[in-house]
Amino acid sequence: MLQKRKINLFLFAAFILLAESVFISCAKKTEEKKAIQEDFSEFEFNGKKLHGKKIQPDYATQFCIYEYEDGFSLIDICGKEKYLIVPEEKYSEGLTCAADGIIKRGMENIYLASSSAYSLWDALGASGKLGFSSIKENDWYIPSASDAMKSGKMLYAGKYRMPDYELLLKSGCKLAIESTMILHVPKVKEKLEQLGIGVFTDYSSYENNPLGRLEWIKVYGEISGCQEAAFSFFNSQANLLKNIIFDSKEIRSSYFYINTRGMAVVRSPDNYVSNMLKCAGSDYLCPKIKNDTDLASRPTLSVSMEEFYKSSKTADFLFYDGNIDPSCTSLAMLKEKNPLLAEFTAVKNGKVWCAKKLIYQDTAEICQIILDMNKIFSAADDKEIFFFERLK
């Protein structure tokens, strides 16, 4: 009897340690930056020195914010770019400073070419300030964005690589929010700036911690003038992760899709999606990367089916990326992609889930997505799962 009690105590202790380690891996606050940042507690603007304090993000590694007197603030994108945010009543054309851009707080008619940012603006109640979109109505999976396009409140203004300059100019657009894809077409950025349209580059895709991605809502809180709402929303969402239920047994999962060449495309070990699964209480399985920092930094890895089978055949759960490959809607269709998939434990046990298209656009719901993953691991009713569908 005593021996049995000792074993139970050992298992309980191991479970507590597992739960703590998984939660810490998700909720670990930012301790190191990827680049040494210059301090901008003092900043010269229009011939005047601004003095303020640095607001360090809790989880994000790609930005920090400086708050100055008189409502001014500076967004430092990890030493890459700096944007001075100027209160509306103090803004005028011709202002000068050492920042890469000067943005009037609360401006409207913004051209959004970073679709993952829309839900953050929406969560702030500020999506009405977004006048233009780089994707068409049918490509939006967030209902409010689709409705805004349908009603004409938000207009299609061309893709990031070929914006409708004439429409933007005619409509008085003064700011474009771009994803890092704009870095591949520098002439477009240059042209926008020549036309008097400032360009703000969103580097949230460089964040590996899912809470780091969500924390970019603080950046858009500064730009929109909804700072308090941004901090409140972020804190309320981060607190949701306290509701995660950890299973006492080890859970293993993998996230993938099969490309047109028949290769398995998996999320790299430290990608934000992989880390979401870890936050939800799972070990993440994928092929090992042998001392290749370039491969490790990529969001996805393309591997042979044999390699994928070797690394993930024992996964308790498989997540299929239906956003990239929407053609897979049943277990039978999954098995048709490669006979090896029929041998996976998760396939045999009917524990394969397909991610809905909404998942990559709805950044504001990252914590809800993690909770969905945790519900899947905890054998919750399928009806309780919103962002994934079980393949049958």
Where are these regions (language model features)?
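Bacterial Sec-exported substrate-binding components of ABC uptake systems
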Residues: 26-118, 229-256, 380-392
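Structured C-terminal subdomain patch of bacterial secreted/periplasmic proteins
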Residues: 32, 114, 207-236, 317-392
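Extracytoplasmic ligand-binding site segments that recognize negatively charged/polar headgroups
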Residues: 108, 115-121, 133-144, 184-187, ...
